[in-house]
């Protein structure tokens, strides 16, 4: 069993700008910081990062990626515990713990259905901590943006001229209605959702306007548990939440852990936050302390 402990933001970051390039939700379809324990056979169509153990039955990864890839399309900091046959359909699988798999098919061109794409590496715990810091920072940044769009009558609408539309809604209101989206002149929409324990009983469907999955981000910045229920359109940022669903994600997902059985399709979040100059180290550390921006590092019991 593993656990997370607090980690300081490295001093090297203090002299840099924040988010000068696309973030992890562009690079990965699925990121979890603890175990991946799907309740059914999970298919992830893009890249995957798992900060804990890989559990579940007969998971499949990299379904929609180029089979000529040889980079690590799946990274698991902990143990490989999945039952049945694990399939890596493009690229390789890197892991940091023990390999307890009963069967593996590496279906990329370089591996020919063998198990040769698996390799053990070090440093994935540190990468998990870095990814958490980055995505927690993005979530806090997005949550602090002023709302520029309107919410009501089952519609998210934007009438401004900026490239980014920002909406605010409570989880209770979100999961009490069907919704449509009208971004107007904006290319991207961020929907900040408040609430700690959130669940869609099946009453909520995302209808017209949600078809461009790469341009929508749901920021569940307070969530500890989240069940989105039906097919969810757009990327989901819920770094401290245990997430579940009984349908598919049409976008990237970043969560504490994932216990659902829907597929995660390869529609990465397409927006890059603006370049932001960080304040002096002492000011920054006080700010991060106040916001609760703490890194997480996975430690393994002896």
Segments (PLM) and residue ranges:
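Bacterial N-terminal signal peptides that target proteins for export
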Residues: 1-8
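Contiguous hydrophobic, core-forming segments of folded domains
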Residues: 90-91, 95-146, 159
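N-terminal signal peptide c-region/cleavage motif recognized by signal peptidases
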Residues: 15-20
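A short, hydrophobic C-terminal helix/tail in secreted or cell-surface proteins
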Residues: 279-297
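Long, polar low-complexity repeats
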Residues: 23-89, 130-275
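Short, charged juxtamembrane terminal tails flanking transmembrane helices
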Residues: 299-302
């Amino acid at each position: 069993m593993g656990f997370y402990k607090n980690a300081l933001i490295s001093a090297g970051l203090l002299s840099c700008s924040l988010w000068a390039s696309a973030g992890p939700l562009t690079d990965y379809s699925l990121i979890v910081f603890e175990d991946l324990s799907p309740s059914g056979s999970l298919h992830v169509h893009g890249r995957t990062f798992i900060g804990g153990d890989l559990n579940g039955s007969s998971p499949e990864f990299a379904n929609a990626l180029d089979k000529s890839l040889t980079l690590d399309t799946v990274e698991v900091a902990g143990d490989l515990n999945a039952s049945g046959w694990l399939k890596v359909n493009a690229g390789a699988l890197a892991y940091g713990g023990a390999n307890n798999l009963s069967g593996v098919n590496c279906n990329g061109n370089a591996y020919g259905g063998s198990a040769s794409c698996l390799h053990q590496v070090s440093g994935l715990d540190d990468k998990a901590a870095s990814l958490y810091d980055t995505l927690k920072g993005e979530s806090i940044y997005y949550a602090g943006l002023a709302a520029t769009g309107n919410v009501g009558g089952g519609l998210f609408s934007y009438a401004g001229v900026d490239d980014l539309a920002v909406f605010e809604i409570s989880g209770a209101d979100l999961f009490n209605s069907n919704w449509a989206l009208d971004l107007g002149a904006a290319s991207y929409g961020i929907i900040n959702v408040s609430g700690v324990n959130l669940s869609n009983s099946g009453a909520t469907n995302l209808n017209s306007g949600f078809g461009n999955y790469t341009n929508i981000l749901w920021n569940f910045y307070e969530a500890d548990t989240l069940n989105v229920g039906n097919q969810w359109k757009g990327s989901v940022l819920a770094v401290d939440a245990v997430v579940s669903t009984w349908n598919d994600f049409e976008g990237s997902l970043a969560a504490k852990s994932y216990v659902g059985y829907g597929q995660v399709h390869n529609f990465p979040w397409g927006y890059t936050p603006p370049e932001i100059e960080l304040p002096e180290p002492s000011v920054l550390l006080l700010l991060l302390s106040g916001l609760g921006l703490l890194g997480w590092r996975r430690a393994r019991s002896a």
